[in-house]
């Protein structure tokens, strides 16, 4: 199975283990073949069966190489007409399977009904959307009609009437023809290619099911067939055919360390197919016991008597082992009756030699009692168990609330960890339930809001009673560690993630129908609370009091706006106005205002805050909380009015990762311009600033803090700066920022104004005097620099220019001499114009004198106010917006279209080829230069239909795609910030109608 996402395991590339100790040899299949003989006869007599693809009589004559080649060629040419390439999306995370887009293989097993056989890990246990492509490149939608609860097979259905240009042929299933030494071909979509034909020979037919690892789907309680065919991702679901064109097995998985492949036998698959064809329920029984095939020598060590061994060897002379209980689930039908290590002798009087016999008996006796004879430590026991319904312990619904998804713990997961099949399983640890950013799956929710959650229905009822924005206690644990229960508090988000839905599987339509459970309860009224503030433990009293000016700022982003991850972020903040509630904080934590912001005082009380200001280049933001809610002795600190210099002696006060305050004396070692590396996908980063470096070992352990004088005057901030993303990890740089870079904005806010910043939209760097001479800077300007510069001898140069439509603008390589007649000696001389204004800040014209290509040039450069994102559209699982500032900074020529800043893991956008950084310029040949036009066009596109899109890559390469809409799982919506209330309002579109949330 070829996966488009790098963090998803490929089924055929997973490391496997046999599940047995020692070498297993062949198990005689004579009884199995006779057991399926009646089923095959029933299948042959069924009126809808297509004639099998049979091309030669098996008369045991020896074929020459050329005859063998021609015969295989004839067979394959017919088989490929039944094989389809499956393009699918598993829409939602479910049972440890991530949401994904992928490709696999299937083959037609009933041409009249339009039934395709493939793997269960392709169909998936959760919502599925897909289509198939036939050999002649005809395309047809498919829906899932069955996925086995345990074994790795499932069925998809298509409408044969939609296939107009080819005659559909079905492959006949012949499980009895899978024999050791048989030459086979695996015909499928190997490694994402439309058609690959891989050759091999069957080497084993009695292998235990392979194990693919923890927290993923694993088959069990069945034999597997082994061969060496070197299949890889994408071949999942391929037919394994013999030279006569019969399907003898189903490709399922493979080893990463060898060319070994694993095929699922067709015996139980054939039985399920017949049930579907005859419109009968596919009953599946279980006593919740996992069996493994163990060789006789190991069975003897576990207590098998010589008499029973002799009987088994005589009855099954080719067998070398019996089934032994590996796992018995607590509270299951077999619990306290069967023990691990018990050897299975018979069921209902039938001597057992294979998994398929066990499956057959259990499937035929759901709800009935069966009698098992086992041997335990040399003693024979007879136990009676009531067969349970396997479908009843397989989740068929899930709940979506607070941005996370939940369902009942499945038999699949419970079996692997030997747990009772009960509990609320968190299949997507996100939103309010983002317990651990490193581990998204495998959590069990034991209680919430101090109420036990033994099952999904109880969980739903509890969640109905919890108001929006409330903080509640959750008890939970991970499947891999039953001995470590965990307790945390979470913030209930029912305003950004307002959906509270229950999705239920519908095997008739193939869609998971949903119903809305409950509307959000309004948030509880906030009450003022008190907090005691403990001074910083230092001898300097003025510095110690600064604990009354420090707090913690945390944010929860609603969506990955501006290509910034929607993570929960936290850092320290400086209270710059205790009376009005203003807090200065790193923009790493407050990248935009489409989020919830919280201020924590003294690690004692939390109050909500709003985003008041975002600096476009200097990496700081200002948020505001309601001071009436805080009854604590907070102090507005004294802020410095002079810039720091190299050699200044300071006090460093930092916050560790555990929010502990640490202090240290330090010295300013360097003040220089920095260039933070840009990310592959453009997003906010600090530019055009001079960073402070200090001589302090403690600072490397702190993610934030402040720099002060001995009298408590705040001289600077110690901030995290977001850099590039490498190997799915965010690179964060720690540097100091002079408080003088923030003073103008702070003063305007304190005086009741609204600060606005207008900047010269270009990137600047520094060069040495030597480089300036080489670039043609005249000697008189060099002498002037040497005379007037008090800090560092350098010239400022243009390193990049943002996109602009102005004819007169700076160019890369320009050396800046002066601005408005003032010599430019450092980056601070190029700071933007800061003022208080209502509406759009008018542009200012600045007189630049630069050296360009060795000549002095005078330029009038217009400043611009950076517009933060205040609107975006969600379409086909992608987030579309006007190109944000980071995009304009990175591009010279910006296409006229809506910009894709993000695409979902399982979305149509990903499946059909829209990437982050793409511009959608046309939809159905209509130009879409802005969001209004785009919305107008896409609202006319019906559900489940194709539209043509023309796009432009980040490198201005045009291309076109077709995209199929799916409004059931991926509706179109618009989120827009109200200019008066500054609240974000969501509108969801259904056809030409819309609903506001």
Curated annotation (Swiss-Prot):
Domain PDZ: 300-378, 779-854
Effect ascribed to mutating residue 621 to T: In strain: YJM269 and YJM270
Reported effect, residue 343 to S: In strain: YJM269 and YJM270
GO molecular function, one term: serine-type endopeptidase activity
Task performed by this protein: Nuclear serine protease which mediates apoptosis through proteolysis of the apoptotic inhibitor BIR1.
Stated family: Belongs to the peptidase S1C family.
Protein name: Pro-apoptotic serine protease NMA111
Organism annotation: Saccharomyces cerevisiae (strain ATCC 204508 / S288c)
Gene name linked to the record: NMA111
């Amino acid at each position: 199975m070829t996966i488009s996402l790098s963090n998803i395991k490929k089924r055929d590339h997973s490391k496997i283990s046999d599940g047995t100790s020692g070498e297993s040899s062949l198990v005689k299949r004579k009884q199995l073949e006779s057991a399926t003989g009646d089923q095959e006869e029933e299948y042959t007599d069924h009126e809808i069966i297509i004639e099998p693809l049979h091309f030669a009589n098996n008369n045991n004559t020896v074929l020459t190489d050329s005859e063998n080649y021609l015969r295989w060629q004839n067979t394959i040419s017919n088989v490929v007409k039944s094989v389809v390439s499956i393009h699918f999306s598993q829409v939602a995370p479910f049972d440890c399977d991530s949401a994904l887009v992928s490709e696999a293989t299937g083959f037609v097993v009933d041409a009249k009904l339009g039934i395709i056989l493939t793997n269960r890990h392709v169909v998936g246990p959760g919502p599925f959307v897909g289509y198939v492509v036939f050999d002649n490149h005809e395309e047809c939608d498919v829906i899932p009609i069955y996925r086995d609860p345990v074994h790795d097979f499932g069925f998809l259905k298509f409408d044969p009437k939609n296939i107009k240009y080819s005659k559909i042929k079905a492959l006949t299933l012949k499980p009895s023809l899978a024999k050791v030494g048989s030459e086979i071909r695996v015909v499928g979509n190997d490694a994402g290619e439309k058609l690959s034909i891989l050759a091999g020979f069957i080497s084993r037919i009695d292998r235990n099911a392979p194990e693919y690892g923890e927290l993923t789907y694993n088959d069990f309680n069945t034999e597997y067939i082994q061969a060496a065919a070197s299949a890889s991702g994408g071949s999942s679901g391929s037919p394994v055919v013999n030279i006569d064109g019969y399907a003898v097995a189903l490709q399922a998985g493979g080893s990463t360390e060898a060319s070994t492949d694993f095929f699922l036998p067709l015996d139980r698959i054939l039985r399920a197919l017949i049930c579907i064809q005859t419109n009968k329920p596919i009953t599946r029984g279980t006593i919740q016991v996992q069996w493994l095939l163990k060789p006789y020598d190991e069975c003897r060590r576990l207590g098998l008597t010589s008499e029973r061994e002799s009987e088994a060897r005589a009855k099954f002379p080719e067998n070398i082992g019996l089934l032994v209980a590996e796992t018995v689930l607590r509270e299951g039908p077999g619990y306290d009756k069967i023990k691990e290590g018990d050897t299975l002798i018979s069921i209902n009087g039938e001597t057992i030699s294979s998994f398929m016999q066990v499956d057959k008996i259990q499937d035929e006796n759901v709800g009935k009692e069966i009698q098992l004879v086992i041997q335990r430590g040399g003693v024979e026991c007879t136990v009676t168990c009531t067969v349970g319904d396997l479908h009843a312990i397989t989740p068929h619904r899930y709940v979506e609330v607070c941005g996370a998804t939940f369902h009942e713990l499945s038999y699949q997961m419970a079996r692997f960890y030997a747990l009772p099949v009960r509990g609320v399983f968190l299949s997507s640890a996100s939103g309010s339930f983002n317990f651990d950013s490193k581990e998204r799956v495998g959590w069990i929710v034991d209680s919430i809001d101090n109420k036990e959650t033994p099952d999904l229905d109880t969980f739903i009822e509890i969640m109905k009673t919890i108001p929006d924005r409330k903080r509640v206690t959750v008890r939970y644990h991970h499947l891999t560690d039953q001995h470590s229960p965990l307790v945390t508090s979470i913030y209930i988000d029912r305003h950004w993630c307002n959906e509270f839905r229950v999705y239920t599987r519908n095997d008739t339509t193939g869609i998971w129908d949903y119903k809305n459970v409950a509307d959000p309860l309004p948030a509880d009224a906030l009450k003022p609370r008190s907090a005691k503030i403990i001074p910083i433990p230092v001898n300097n009293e003025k510095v110690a009091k600064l604990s009354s000016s420090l707090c913690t700022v945390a944010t929860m982003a609603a969506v990955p706006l501006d290509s910034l991850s929607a993570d929960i972020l936290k850092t320290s903040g400086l209270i710059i106005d205790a009376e009005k509630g203003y807090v200065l904080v790193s923009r790493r934590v407050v990248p935009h205002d489409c989020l919830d912001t919280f201020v924590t005082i003294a690690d004692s009380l939390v109050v909500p805050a709003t985003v008041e200001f975002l600096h476009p280049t200097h990496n700081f933001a200002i948020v505001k909380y309601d001071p009436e809610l805080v009854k604590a002795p907070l102090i507005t600190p004294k802020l410095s009015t002079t810039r720091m210099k190299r050699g200044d002696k300071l006090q460093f006060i930092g916050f560790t990762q555990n929010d502990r305050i640490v202090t240290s004396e330090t010295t300013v070692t360097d003040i220089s311009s920095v260039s933070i590396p840009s990310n592959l996908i453009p997003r906010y980063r600090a530019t055009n600033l001079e960073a402070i470096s200090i001589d302090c070992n403690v600072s490397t352990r702190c993610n934030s803090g402040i720099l002060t004088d001995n009298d408590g005057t705040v001289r600077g901030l110690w901030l995290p700066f977001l850099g590039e993303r490498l190997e799915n990890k965010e690179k964060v740089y720690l540097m100091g920022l002079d408080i003088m870079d923030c003073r103008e904005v702070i003063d305007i806010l304190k005086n009741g104004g609204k600060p606005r910043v207008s900047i010269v939209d270009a990137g600047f760097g520094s060069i040495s005097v030597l480089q300036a001479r080489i670039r043609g800077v005249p000697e008189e300007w060099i002498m002037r620099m040497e005379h007037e510069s008090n800090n560092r001898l350098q010239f400022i140069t243009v390193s990049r220019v943002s996109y602009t439509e102005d004819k007169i603008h700076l160019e890369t390589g320009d050396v800046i001499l002066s601005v408005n007649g003032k010599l430019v000696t450092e980056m601070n001389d190029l700071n933007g114009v800061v003022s208080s204004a209502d509406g759009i800040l008018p542009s200012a014209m600045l007189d630049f004198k630069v050296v360009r290509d060795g000549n002095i040039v005078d330029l009038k450069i217009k400043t611009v106010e950076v517009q933060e994102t205040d609107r975006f559209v969600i379409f086909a699982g992608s987030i579309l917006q006007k190109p944000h500032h980071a995009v304009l900074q990175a591009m010279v020529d910006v296409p006229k279209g809506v910009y894709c800043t993000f695409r979902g893991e399982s979305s149509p956008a990903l499946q059909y080829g829209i990437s982050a950084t793409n511009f959608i310029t046309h939809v159905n040949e209509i130009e879409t230069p802005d969001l209004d036009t785009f919305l107008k066009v896409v609202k006319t596109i019906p559900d489940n239909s194709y539209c043509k899109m023309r796009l432009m890559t980040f490198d201005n390469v045009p291309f076109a795609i077709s995209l199929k809409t799916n409004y059931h799982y991926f509706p179109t919506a618009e989120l827009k910030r109200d200019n008066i209330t500054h609240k974000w309002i969501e509108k969801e579109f259904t056809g030409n109608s819309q609903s506001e949330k």
